[in-house]
Amino acid sequence: MIVLYVLRTCPYCNSALQLLKENKIKHKAIYVETNEEKELYKKQNRMNTFPQIFMQVDRDNYMKVGGCDDLIEIVNVCKSVRGSNVSLDSIYYMYQNMYSK
């Protein structure tokens, strides 16, 4: 599952959510409602922008994907390699090959 920390009025957050919906990728949006929450997640996740996107790799562990541009890049690479069938497994595989070196 992809987990996103999002702001309701953020166009990048909306783009990331739309991309996941269009590709039928299982995800959960956590809406950040207050400035206090925003500052907490920025500090906790060590990211200054939104959306903050993570991939669940097992029951208790999540891997940071990054922001909207990172998600778009990974999905586009998956599509170029695997065609229109983008799955959570293919995103994980591409992420590992693109960023874990």
Predicted feature residues:
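Alpha-helical interaction elements in eukaryotic regulators
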Residues: 12, 37, 67-70
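Local sequence-structure signature of Cys/Sec-based thiol-disulfide redox active-site neighborhoods
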Residues: 1-28
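A short beta-strand-loop structural module common to alpha/beta enzyme folds
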Residues: 26-36
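Non-catalytic, surface beta->alpha helical segment in thiol-disulfide oxidoreductase systems
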Residues: 55-95, 99
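Short intrinsically disordered terminal tails
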Residues: 1, 100-101
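Structural micro-motif
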Residues: 44-55, 68
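Residues that form ligand- and interface-recognition hot spots within folded domains
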Residues: 8, 31, 69
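N-terminal beta-loop-helix "entrance" segment that forms/cooperates
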Residues: 37-44
